Curated annotation (Swiss-Prot):
Species: Salmonella paratyphi C (strain RKS4594)
Binding site for siroheme: 483
Reaction it catalyzes: hydrogen sulfide + 3 NADP(+) + 3 H2O = sulfite + 3 NADPH + 4 H(+)
Family: Belongs to the nitrite and sulfite reductase 4Fe-4S domain family.
GO annotation terms (biological process): cysteine biosynthetic process; hydrogen sulfide biosynthetic process; sulfate assimilation
EC number: 1.8.1.2
Protein name in UniProt: Sulfite reductase [NADPH] hemoprotein beta-component
Pathway(s) where this gene product acts: Sulfur metabolism; hydrogen sulfide biosynthesis; hydrogen sulfide from sulfite (NADPH route): step 1/1
Keyword Transmembrane helix: no
Named cofactor requirement(s): siroheme; [4Fe-4S] cluster
Main function: Component of the sulfite reductase complex that catalyzes the 6-electron reduction of sulfite to sulfide. This is one of several activities required for the biosynthesis of L-cysteine from sulfate.
Length: 570
């Protein structure tokens, strides 16, 4: 081996309780089927509370009314979040019409939530509607398998409407990788789709009987766009094209953003370059990365179980050589690639296939009929006449894809009539938040409900300093798990307590640098005071084309994070 690994390949010790739960679950069945019929509680009990995550669901409750219900001696208002498996974010208009109807008829909130994992979520599914939602998805060719917990999650793919052939090829690989890494257990089909039990022994040749040590995230990236934020993910296939045709991938492994407040064994980390591989080795390499993490990942401490920590413990070269051994290949040197941005191009883009693509800005991905802006109805009306597909982006926006010239005016009119094409600032387009309150059980501070008014105030600061058309990549996440991807933002707010955030600065526009904590546990007025001063300096002192994050590093306002395992907390 080219490198002496700094730590053991396998962490010995008492396994975490999650490992017991998986082992005893009979390949993810548990007693979910029996629990479904228990009408005494609106939730799932015991291990099933965690097992349903493997089936794409999280048990939540409405935290706005939690105390009130407790005072009335009532259990929390339990309801499920369901996340669909949608590799590359592509969804047909028939599928869209089905999910629109389910959201309206069978969820507490009536909304569809686009996520930065390039799929949609339903919030507020009561227990009685859990089986029907899986059956509805199945009826239109969708499922929620492996969109949560210790598996390979929804596979992302750059939403590139212009280079249509390259997008089509990359999207096919995203689907193939997703299918190849799915669990083989029949538990999902038996419990939700009433498929009969087959008298065979379940086996998981890739994931293993106890699945992965922790969640695992995969992307297919088409430079120069980094819209999927590759450095937030465990395994990334960067598309390398020749004459507009896909020929292979650069592989980057070990990105991840979640941390725990005050736990210095946790840190955000960018992914490491392993090398280039021709297309025919893609699935073998994907499997080799996953099985190496399966066997070497830390199963004693879930806070230290992700691929990024395995790489730091055993060494990048050791991990890479094991992947080569398992896949039966040698990586070629990394091929040149560069990123120039990661935002979506809002509005119409004409593809090289002569079709039009309309990217609609959906603030925080929340699709609902608002007063004067019936977004949900508008998208439903478009879905009824559009002959192409919809594509959800990793920025929580929606593309009406493959619109022929003859349909363009009709679709634009529907979009305008329903408030889907209202003008918004560049700053708003480049701001994003996770869901957080009231449904997320992990939320420490507001995010989705906080961001719109906070963005108003940041826009006012930009205006005050004479740069109203500028933008700063800004992210708010309600807790340090980091679903809002604040740890790749130029301005990242991480929830600490109600009304309080840690302010991180020094990321860059293209998402290749981790920001550092600038101020801890501060309120909105304190954050705005700091930003007012710093944005004022940026407006006056920046170099041509210099983004806010790059300026804060160059001006010495923040020290860049160079080696997160060692200097993230400094």
């Amino acid at each position: 081996m080219s490198e002496k690994h700094p730590g053991p390949l396998v962490v010995e010790g008492k396994l975490s309780d999650a490992e017991r739960m998986k082992l005893e679950s009979n390949y993810l069945r548990g007693t979910i089927a029996e629990d479904l019929n228990d009408g005494l509680t609106g939730g799932f009990k015991g291990d099933n509370f965690l097992l349903i995550r493997f089936h794409g669901m999280y048990q939540q409750d409405d935290r706005d009314i939690r105390a009130e219900r407790a005072a009335q001696k009532l259990e929390p208002r339990h309801a499920m979040l369901l996340r669909c498996r949608l590799p590359g974010g592509v969804i047909t208009t028939t599928q869209w019409q089905a999910i629109d109807k389910f959201a309206a008829d069978n969820t507490i909130y009536g909304s569809i939530r686009l996520t930065n994992r390039q799929t949609f979520q339903f919030h507020g599914i009561l227990k009685k509607n859990v089986k029907p939602v899986h059956q509805m998805l199945h009826s239109v060719g969708l499922d929620a398998l492996a969109t949560a917990n210790d598996m390979n999650r929804n596979v992302l793919c750059t939403s590139n409407p212009y280079e249509s052939q390259l997008h089509a090829e990359a999207y096919e690989w995203a689907k193939k990788i997703s299918e190849h890494l799915l669990p083989r257990t029949r538990a999902y089909a038996e419990i939700w789709l009433d498929q009969e039990k087959v008298a065979t022994t379940d086996e998981e040749p890739i994931l293993g009987a106890t699945y992965l040590p922790r969640k695992f995230k995969t992307t297919v990236v088409i430079p120069p766009q980094n819209d999927i934020d590759l450095h937030a993910n465990d395994m990334n296939f960067v598309a390398i094209a020749e004459n507009g045709k896909l020929v292979g991938f650069n592989l980057l492994v070990g990105g991840g953003l979640s941390i725990e407040h005050g736990n210095k064994k946790t840190y955000a980390r960018t992914a490491s370059e392993f090398g280039y591989l021709p297309l025919e080795h893609t699935l073998a390499v994907a499997e080799a990365v996953v099985t190496t993490q399966r066997d070497w990942g830390n199963r004693t401490d879930r806070k230290n179980a992700k691929t990024k920590y395995t790489l730091e413990r055993v060494g990048v070269d050791t991990f890479k050589e094991e992947v080569e051994r398992r896949a039966g290949i040698k990586f070629e040197p990394i091929r040149p690639y560069e990123f120039t941005g990661r935002g979506d191009r809002i509005g119409w883009v004409k593809g090289i296939d002569n079709n039009w693509h309309l990217t609609l800005f959906i603030e925080n991905g929340r699709i609902l009929d608002y007063p004067g802006r019936p977004l949900k109805t508008g998208l439903l009306e478009i879905a009824k006449i559009h002959q192409g597909e919809f594509r959800i982006t990793a920025n929580q926006n929606l593309i009406i894809a493959s619109v022929p010239e003859s349909q363009k005016a009709k679709i634009e009119k529907l979009a305008r009539d329903h408030g889907l094409m209202n003008a918004v600032s560049a700053q708003r387009e480049n701001s994003m938040a996770c869901v957080s309150f009231p449904t997320c059980p992990l939320a420490m501070a507001e995010a989705e409900r906080f961001l719109p008014s906070f963005t108003d105030k940041v826009e006012a600061i930009l205006e005050k300093h004479g740069i109203p058309d500028e933008h700063i990549v800004m992210r708010v996440t309600g807790c340090p798990n980091g679903c809002g991807r604040a740890m790749l933002a130029e301005i990242g707010l991480v929830g600490k307590a109600p009304g309080r955030y840690n302010l991180h600065l020094g990321g860059n526009r293209i998402g290749t640098r981790i920001p550092r904590m600038y101020q801890e546990n501060i309120t909105e007025p304190d954050i705005l005071a700091s930003l007012d001063q710093l944005i004022g300096r940026w407006a006056k002192e920046r170099e041509a084309g210099e983004g806010f994050g790059d300026f804060t590093v160059r001006a010495g306002i923040i020290r860049p994070v160079l080696d997160p395992a060692r200097d993230f907390w400094e």
